[in-house]
Amino acid sequence: MPFMTERPLTPREFLDECIAFKRERLTGGRFLAALVQGNVTAAQLRLWAKDMYHFVQPGIPALTAWLAHAPTAVERESARLIARNLAGELGYLREPDHRDLYLKLLDEGFGISEAEAKEHLPLAGTIGATTALCAFCRSSFAEGLGAFGLALEMQVPGRPNGAAVLYEALRRLGLSESALEFYRIHVEAEEEHGENAERAVAPFIQTREQQALVRHAFRWTVIALAGMQQGFDAYLS
């Protein structure tokens, strides 16, 4: 699909295009496959967990900045849907702040303090994915929909829920239910957040130009996320 189509796609056509792109490009890597199979060492797991700290922690401030761009004078349903996602991430709906849950995972699951995680220098792919996601969320509401809403949170039909896969893999490796609360609550949250993003995007992809803007943010973020996943392979050596 070109950067800008000859005619505007319907919202369903646009989402189907995004799903196909995400299915093709975001396939994981050798490290994540080894983690799921239980073939990683404790040291390798600790490196991965510390890397992910640098992806998880900036995400919620980026989501807050994204919501601040929402144009509510003409259409406010999209802002309401994304605000619900933000409320969940910040711990105002059911579970605690997701950043705090990740710190609990580090502490209880790996014996890693936040100070130690901060000292860890993340891989280039992790830096790239974090930077791309945060940049688009701070650029415009439409680009945030492409990056955070569709590239990160939209589910690919027929593909296992990513949080569920990691939850089960880490549970088999011996992590406690308490430590794994971060991934357990994301099993349900990812589905809801992805559906909210799909519903929110429709008013912002009515023209070819709008679709090109969202497509650009979506594709770049998917490629950056793929680079992060494949970058973890360095921890296998």
Predicted regions, residues:
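Non-heme di-metal
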Residues: 2-237
